[in-house]
């Protein structure tokens, strides 16, 4: 990292609570991010080339915390009793804003959700705010959250106090398109197991209780049920165990299912229907069913309109016009994230920034795209816009108050 961002530390907000030139502060943040761009690119590629699954992100944790510490942040490693979480702090008092980093990868396809870019973007926003935030003007927390891909790292962090002193939270996520209101829905992850009885499939099939039959019947029942599901509901699964040899009736079969819906309350309704399919198949075949949860359910993302509109305005600084609320078009739809749980606790936004690719998230093509110079440039642009949005919240008490009123409204 160059020294430019460190030299500027605290200059932008010298008179924040007075009549600050907010434009000067934003330019200071943008300059700091630009100064660090080459180092952030190295950081992103380092994480990209060392993909680690959820709760195993030891390398990412090390390089991120070292980078932030060298940049002058006060860093707590292995924060919140999670070995690969961290909290990096600059400043103190109120307002206190949090920006999240994610850095876990996917099995077999590496950083196919671009978490290397998310990690670098969180650091970039932190550097920008450090360059503009002077003494007594509030705090910025860069929070390293492990295990977004199914482990619910942010949920554990929330339960252990990560947001107790936070006024608002934000993060960025790569996507094939740009958007400030991505449709990120609630999810639960289930393990389905059927237990039957072995028998010779040719000589004595009548002595068997076929666990695979139960699983196939449940799979077919769920497929038939889709005709009556809401357009926003999603149920998808894979068979992880279906027997060992064709001439042995399987006494065990298993699958993993993801069940999603627009809200946590609608998810509860859908769960009951899906569970009915699993239970009915057990009854029909005489098998025993075990249905268990794979980690914590994620709640839906509730985008704070006040902050999202400020982000859209700040993206305009770079001649990017984002679609308004309800006009997302091709932005991420139907995916899920534990940032949804954050958005249920404090006013939050989770914008997506488009990187040049025809590939969707969670595909090998997106893995490759997440390492390109073009993707890095888009990340830098979005990080500057997010830092400027945070500056608006620091510098305009009425804006943060409006975001909090929206968050507290019962109809949100």
Predicted regions and their residues:
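Generic non-transmembrane alpha-helical segments
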Residues: 28, 32-36, 42-46, 50, ...
């Amino acid at each position: 990292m160059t020294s430019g961002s460190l030299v500027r530390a605290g200059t932008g907000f010298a008179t924040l609570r007075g009549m600050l030139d907010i434009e000067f502060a934003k330019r200071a943040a943008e300059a700091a991010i630009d100064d660090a761009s080459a180092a952030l690119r190295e950081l992103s590629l380092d994480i990209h080339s060392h993909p680690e699954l959820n709760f195993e992100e030891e390398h990412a944790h090390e390089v991120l915390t070292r980078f932030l510490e060298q940049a002058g942040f006060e860093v707590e490693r292995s924060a919140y009793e999670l070995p690969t979480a961290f909290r990096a702090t600059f400043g103190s008092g109120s307002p206190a804003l949090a920006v999240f980093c994610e850095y876990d990868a996917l099995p077999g396809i590496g950083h196919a959700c671009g978490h290397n870019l998310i990690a670098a973007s969180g650091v970039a926003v932190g550097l920008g705010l450090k360059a503009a935030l002077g003494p007594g003007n509030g705090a910025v927390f860069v929070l390293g959250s492990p295990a977004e891909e199914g482990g619910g790292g942010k949920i554990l962090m929330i339960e252990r106090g990560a947001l107790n002193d936070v006024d608002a939270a934000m993060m960025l996520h790569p996507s094939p398109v740009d958007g400030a209101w991505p449709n990120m829905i609630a999810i639960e992850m289930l393990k389905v197991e059927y237990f039957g009885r072995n028998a010779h499939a040719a000589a004595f099939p009548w002595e068997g209780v076929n666990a695979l039959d139960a699983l196939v019947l449940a799979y077919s029942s769920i497929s038939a049920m889709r005709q009556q599901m809401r357009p926003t509901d999603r149920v998808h699964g894979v068979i992880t165990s279906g027997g060992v040899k064709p001439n042995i009736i399987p006494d065990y079969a298993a699958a993993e299912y993801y069940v999603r819906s627009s809200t946590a309350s609608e998810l509860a309704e859908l769960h009951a229907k899906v569970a009915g399919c699993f239970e009915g198949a057990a009854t029909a075949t005489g098998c025993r069913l075990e249905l268990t949860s794979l980690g914590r359910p994620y709640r839906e993302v509730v985008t704070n309109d006040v902050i999202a509109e400020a982000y859209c305005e700040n993206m305009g600084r770079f001649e990017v016009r984002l679609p308004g609320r309800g006009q997302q078009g091709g932005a991420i739809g139907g995916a899920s994230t534990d940032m949804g749980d954050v958005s249920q606790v404090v006013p939050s936004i989770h914008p997506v920034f488009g990187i040049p690719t025809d590939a969707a998230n969670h595909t090998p093509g997106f893995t490759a795209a997440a390492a390109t110079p073009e993707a890095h440039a888009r990340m830098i642009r979005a990080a500057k816009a997010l830092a400027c949005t945070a500056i608006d919240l620091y510098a305009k008490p009425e804006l943060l108050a409006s975001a909090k009123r929206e968050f507290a409204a019962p109809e949100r």
